[in-house]
Amino acid sequence: MCNAEFKGDCMIKKIPMIIGGAERDTSEHEYRELTLNSYKVSIPIINQDDVEAIKSQSVENNLNINQIVNFLYTVGQKWKSENYSRRLTYIRDLVRFLGYSPEMAKLEANWISMILSSKSALYDIVETELGSRHIVDEWLPQGDCYVKAMPKGKSVHLLAGNVPLSGVTSIIRAILTKNECIIKTSSADPFTAIALASSFIDTDEHHPISRSMSVMYWSHNEDIAIPQQIMNCADVVVSWGGYDAIKWATEHTPVNVDILKFGPKKSIAIVDNPVDITASAIGVAHDICFYDQQACFSTQDIYYIGDNIDAFFDELVEQLNLYMDILPKGDQTFDEKASFSLIEKECQFAKYKVEKGDNQSWLLVKSPLGSFGNQPLARSAYIHHVSDISEITPYIENRITQTVTVTPWESSFKYRDVLASHGAERIVESGMNNIFRVGGAHDGMRPLQRLVKYISHERPYTYSTKDVAVKIEQTRYLEEDKFLVFVP
């Protein structure tokens, strides 16, 4: 669904717009031209006709959870095929336009397949977050009521471009709760949401899930009169990104509409005097290298408790070199390379221990506690020597620190209470920062609960409660002044 045209000597990739599960005719639209990794991308700008189409869009979704999961599984099997054209195009786009290494791009496509194909996990997400996988389909008895979880309606997803899978996750959550999806892509990644929605259409263009997909782009920095109309029709908003993105979502969402905010976070690693230094270093290296530290869960600072920090430092160097081969770093801009070099020189000038990989593939700095320099990301990390957990807690910030990885795993039980009390939102084993386990929270919340509205059907007055074993005849109680007789 993505095509290209030639402008001068340059090939420009054209990104489609999808509304209601159908590619929009944008031949008369204005276009915005983006430059990604020195290549041109052309994206249609939404107009009033598009807004009216979105407003009038209403998909009757009578699917049960089994039908939803089975459809997602079918799509996931397409992504599992290495010959699926949508997958191949997606991988090429990530490499060409986003600067991913081929290995990184392939891994991203593999994860899309994994998420969609993991039927048990999809069921369990609903079960653990909503209390029952049946509550989205049936009225369930709870206490003295029957309760059902209904979709909010139109869910607007304001996606970030740094972590493609966050957008996939956002969309899957809305699908599991039977919401329509209005997806605003990021200028940094206009490919993932389109590829996912298009794969739904490839599978069955008439399916309610396919028809509930709308994918488009607008800029926060231009006239937002038309985008504001889309925001005004939202029943729930899911916002991903940095401070400016979250601020924009807050300012342009109607006051009576809930916003799920997945804003900027930082993450750290704790290495607690491991016996198996190699195993610990492998885990920490993975957590530094995955997404080149662009994700909220990416390790930026390492705190080493124990006496063998130099041995660990040397082993971590070896493992970072390994990741340079098995998961090569993505392309960097000139400014990013300059920032990387500047931090390296500053740390060397400060007499810190500094090691770096070939071609700026990674940077590791051993620095005193509290001597934090700038963080260029791009697989750069600071390691600090501490004596115990009390020296680490001042650097765990409430609402800022997301993931704390711990190695060895057994030490996490020792530290989890103090980490949680100081603001950590996730505690995971080193090497697992990118895998959000089923049943866990995301940024301190259970997102599916925010994507539904619970409707209660309460039992009649003839239904006695645990504390009052008679009919609840309120008029009679008032007439006979016997209310207190029934107080437990």
From Swiss-Prot:
GO terms for molecular function: acyl-CoA dehydrogenase activity; long-chain-fatty-acyl-CoA reductase activity. The keyword Transferase does not apply. This is Long-chain acyl-protein thioester reductase. It catalyses: a long-chain fatty aldehyde + NADP(+) + CoA = a long-chain fatty acyl-CoA + NADPH + H(+). Pathway: Lipid metabolism; fatty acid reduction for biolumincescence. CDD domains: ALDH_Acyl-CoA-Red_LuxC. GO terms for biological process: bioluminescence. Gene3D superfamilies: Aldehyde Dehydrogenase, Chain A, domain 1 (3.40.605.10), Aldehyde Dehydrogenase, Chain A, domain 2 (3.40.309.10). It comes from Photobacterium phosphoreum. Belongs to the LuxC family. Its EC number is 1.2.1.50. The keyword Amino-acid biosynthesis does not apply. LuxC is the fatty acid reductase enzyme responsible for synthesis of the aldehyde substrate for the luminescent reaction catalyzed by luciferase. Keywords: Luminescence, NADP, Oxidoreductase. It is an enzyme of class 1 (oxidoreductase). SUPFAM superfamilies: ALDH-like.
